[in-house]
Amino acid sequence: MLKTIKSWILGKRNQEINQLISPRPSTSLNSYSAPTPKKTYRKTTQSTQEPSNSAPPSVNQKSNQQKQVKKLVDQLTKIDSLGHHTNVQQKQKIEILIRKLYREDLGEEAAQIVELRLWSLEESLEASQILKMEPKTRRILISMKLERWIRTLLRGKCDNLQMFQARYQEVMSYLQQNKVETVIMEEAWNLSVHLIQDQ
């Protein structure tokens, strides 16, 4: 009886062992592909999509030129918030003068005088930058600067030479730091002083 029970137990255990050893009808390992870890996948896509940081020399040169032009134009606004015109008659004269500055020979002559004086400022980086511009661009920039100075010198109530000279004193600290603006301001003075003398 004991032998029978023992042999039955051994047979049962052998069956279980055979079931564990025998292959199961599951998907084979060869057809299984493990998913790529998320971190690795992100790094791979980023490395393929990120553009190169190195820009061609021509792009860098163009951006530097744009910065220089922007710096020059920004200087025009430094004196733009000093006041507004109150005298209507004087304002009309100023607008006529500025129109001539852009459209008539007066502006061409004034720009040429400024250019000649800028040539003497060899040590000035800003002067050399202006002189390297194309003639048309240079003329427009000088005319804009002349207009700003005319409006600055004749702003508000300015109906006599004392007031006119007072405007000059107010911007002296700025002019001492910028030789180019001094040259342009002096030409603007010559262009606009007759508006005061005529009154």
UniProtKB/Swiss-Prot annotation:
Pfam families: Paramyxo_C (PF01692). One of its GO terms (biological process) is symbiont-mediated suppression of host JAK-STAT cascade via inhibition of STAT1 activity. Residues 58-67 have a biased composition (Low complexity). Keywords: Host-virus interaction, Inhibition of host innate immune response by virus, Inhibition of host interferon signaling pathway by virus, Inhibition of host STAT1 by virus, Inhibition of host STAT2 by virus, Interferon antiviral system evasion, Viral immunoevasion. Residues 19-34, 43-57 have a biased composition (Polar residues). InterPro entries: Paramyxo_C. Residues 19-67 are annotated as: Disordered. Belongs to the respirovirus protein C family. This is Protein C. It comes from Human parainfluenza 3 virus (strain Wash/47885/57) (HPIV-3).
